[in-house]
Amino acid sequence: MTLRRFSYTFQARILRGLQARPVFVLPSRSHSTKARPVVDIADAAEHIPTVNIRNWAIISHIDHGKSTLSDRILELTGVIEKSSGKQRVLDKLSVEQRRGITVKAQTCSMIYEYNDEQYLLNLIDTPGHVDFSSEVTHSLAACEGCILLVDATRGIQAQTVSNFYLAFARNLVIIPVLNKIDLPTAEPEKVLAQLEEVFELDRKEALLVSSKTGKNVPELIDAIIQRVPHPICDENASLKCVLIDSWFNTHRGVIGLVRILDGKLVAGAAIYSVNTHRKYVVNEVGFMHPNPVEAQVLLAGQVGYVNWNMKNSAEAILGDTFTQVGHVVKAMPGFEKQQPKVYVNAFPLVRSDYDSLSDSIDRLALNDRSIFVEKDTSDTLGIGWRLGFLGSLHLSVFLDRLKDEYKHEVLVTAPTVPYRITWKDGMTSMVSNPSNFPDARTAYAQVEEPMALVTLVFPREYVGPVMNLCESCRGTQQKCSFLSTARCVLEYLLPMSRLMDGFFDQLKSCTHGYGSLEYEDAGFAPSDIVKLSYLVNGMPIDALCTILHRSSVLRTARASLQRLKSLIPRQLYEVALQAMCEKHIIARETISAARKNVTAKCYGGDVTRKMKLLKNQREGKKRMKQFGNVSIDQGVFYDFLMKS
């Protein structure tokens, strides 16, 4: 299969308008001398010329060994000590260590001696999951080259292709590297053939390494120095730097990670944003090594952090250009903001925690600019937020980080996607909050749901189960091809709502962990979408409302009512739980009344005494049912929404 047959969709998505050109890495030169690591990076970097700077990233599909390879490189450059343990130094977040995945791009500057010259190597370790593709995009903006890492046991997978074309579109030098060659299941020859067939990369330029044992990693560092070009910049020009990442420090405020395009950045300098015109005084600059190391200056071509007295996280706009006060430079294009694909409502478990929780959410959003944050309110749960994410894993990681880093837990409603509604008067609007979705079909002319063009890569023996999975999710097959004799590529048009509803886990299950996917927005398509509401004793509970396809309404309603019935405690009167769709009750569960024995103290006497007590009890329960409100504890909502 040729490049055009397999990757034409990716070319159309990412390279539209670019001229086709072959991608070949530069030829290798002489082998290096033994590395002599330098400890004081701040002092050494100040004397390294621009021609000896290399800015590069590692890109790959998830679980292909990026973080482990980074550890071996850090060991060889003297940044960390050699260890037989599993370190994953650049995976700094506890959620990354716990899950074993990279969710946040991390930078590390290193000094390496090659042919008796010192080189400054700036490494960026990027995530491999599709939900964090924006991190890859921002990272590549600071690089001149990248390592395309491919698992020799699995071959090219969906995100391998997507990340390749992100680097290709930026005209970066791409070094193909096969990892895990020490495993008995490795098939390097087959994977090399895939690299030639899919990407038109010269197999002779590929390097075979083992990030676990460190085999051929020194040769890889040499190849980076030989093949990745140095930054093109003017050291004597006015300062010009671009913000590529930011995070919040409790004591220092907003810290930025910048790439110096021209000139130099020193502590004490007065700078301003070319876009917002806000001014800042630089308190400190330095390198990530991988922890912050203070330096006197950041020179042209270098990547480092800056502490600049920025207190408001909203002022740190990724892609923003900065220069010295009194100078004028042309602003860089900036980064295109990705639109959220899944939304949830979030509320504090304890309402008094709202202010501190709001600060924590803002600080996390500063570190991950793909998160959408908007204040929202609920009649049931009070004031909260409307949050948007790039996928279900993105949402899950956000909640974990909120708990790990800020000790906060939130009550999160069922995820929804944005729907496009055409009203009777011809006007259209986007609705992602179930509370804003119309109850009756007569209120609107048409509802359209977002679609995703999904590319799935998996072993060919799982074609049947994968096709059945896609069909059960209302998918429409677009293409079917074979990457090789052993790997199949399916392209399906799927509703975004089904893709976000555990589809990736189901794919992994039916392919025994060997399936992968990549997707892109495919516009909107008309669909039979309705709102499902829940009532307790006739009172609507807005926090439980959801939007879904009509085919799933009855099944979802019955299952939800049964779960809700098991969570709400019994009252002294009968409680009706109902599910309503388009103003019609479609399902019901009843919580029977808790019986109190009012005749317990009647040990004898006239039977009419007992009858009178029972009659009074029935009338009292009738009044309670008519006028009483069921008070639902916050924990009931938490248990219900977490299990759903």
Curated annotation (Swiss-Prot):
GO MF assignments: GTP binding; GTPase activity; mitochondrial ribosome binding
Principal subcellular localisation of the protein: mitochondrion
Transit peptide: 1-31
Subcellular localization: Mitochondrion inner membrane
Pfam family, one: GTP_EFTU
E.C. number(s) listed in UniProt: 3.6.5.-
InterPro entries from the UniProt entry: EF-4, EFG_III/V, EFG_V-like, G_TR_CS, LepA_C_sf, LepA_CTD, LepA_IV, P-loop_NTPase
Keywords from the UniProt entry: GTP-binding, Hydrolase, Membrane, Mitochondrion, Mitochondrion inner membrane, Nucleotide-binding, Protein biosynthesis, Transit peptide
Any GO BP annotation: translation
Highest taxon, organism lineage: Eukaryota
PANTHER family xref list: TRANSLATION FACTOR GUF1, MITOCHONDRIAL, TRANSLATION FACTOR GUF1-RELATED
Summary of the function given for this chain in its UniProt record: Promotes mitochondrial protein synthesis. May act as a fidelity factor of the translation reaction, by catalyzing a one-codon backward translocation of tRNAs on improperly translocated ribosomes. Binds to mitochondrial ribosomes in a GTP-dependent manner.
Name used for this protein in its record: Translation factor guf1, mitochondrial
Organism: Schizosaccharomyces japonicus (strain yFS275 / FY16936)
